Each structure stands twice: as C-alpha cells, then as structure tokens.
C-alpha cells in the first residue's frame, strides 16, 4: 500500500479495468506485468482524482467520455509533457523505445501522448529554446 496525494494505492485482482479510483482509494490490477505500466495506470487514476467529478463508468455518455479524456491528458502531461520530451532528447534519446525508457513510461503511453500533442499543436511547437516536431516524425531541435 502506498500513498500519493493523500490517496491509498493498492494492487487488487480487478476484473476488466486495469485501474479504478473511488473516493481516496486507487486500485491497480494486480497482474499488470510491469512497473512502468502500473505507473502509467496510476497516473491516469491520479488524473481522475484531479479532474473528474462523479461516477463516469458509463462511457456512452459524452460528458463521461470527456472526463475520461481529461484524466488521460492530465496523465500525459504529468508523466511526459513537452519538457519531458526535451529532457529525453537532451539525454540522448532519439527513438520512442529509449525515450519511453528514459521517461519511465510504456511505449504505448508515450505514443498516445505524442499523438495527443500532434493533434493539439499540429506539425510542431516551440518550447523555450526548442522546437518539437511531431510530423512527419518526432524530433527536437535546439535553437541557438
């Protein structure tokens, strides 16, 4: 059992979902194979804690879908963020595998985050003295 933001986090034998939050308790599916995947699941559940109001189990409801997405975006920004992409580049990561390893997230989580950033920012965005390119491939360029 661990505590994050005053929440209790436990591994449980969940059915279906890999993570669940109720009040101040987060359950992570016990048989999730890696710590990286568990960390990504925990990040999304923390996103629900910070952004979700009420019960959103019914994802047929548009409002619930929006809240689910908002929690996921919180997780992307918390675990990766644009500055995380820059830090990984500065560390020497030049492919998704090494970047995901450096950021301690799964490749799938990183891929989904980049897809979100591409949709939000388009082909590229500027952050401090860097340009992050999302198309045609992920790339970071330091401005001098």
Q: Predicted regions span which residues?
A:
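Active-site hotspot residues in diverse enzymes, especially metal/ion-binding acidic/histidine motifs
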Residues: 1-41, 46-144
């Amino acid at each position: 059992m661990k505590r994050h933001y005053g929440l209790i986090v436990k591994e449980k034998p969940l059915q279906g979902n890999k993570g669940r939050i109720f009040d101040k308790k987060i359950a992570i599916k016990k048989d999730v194979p890696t710590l990286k995947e568990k960390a990504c699941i925990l990040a999304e559940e923390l996103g629900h804690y910070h952004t979700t109001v009420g019960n959103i189990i019914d994802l047929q409801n548009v409002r619930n879908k929006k809240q689910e997405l908002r929690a996921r975006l919180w997780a992307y920004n918390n675990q990766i963020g644009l500055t995380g992409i820059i830090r990984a580049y500065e560390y020497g990561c030049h492919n998704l595998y090494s970047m995901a390893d450096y950021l301690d997230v799964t490749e799938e989580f990183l891929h989904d985050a980049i897809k979100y950033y591409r949709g939000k920012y388009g082909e590229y965005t500027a952050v401090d003295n860097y340009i992050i390119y999302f198309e045609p491939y992920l790339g970071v360029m330091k401005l001098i």
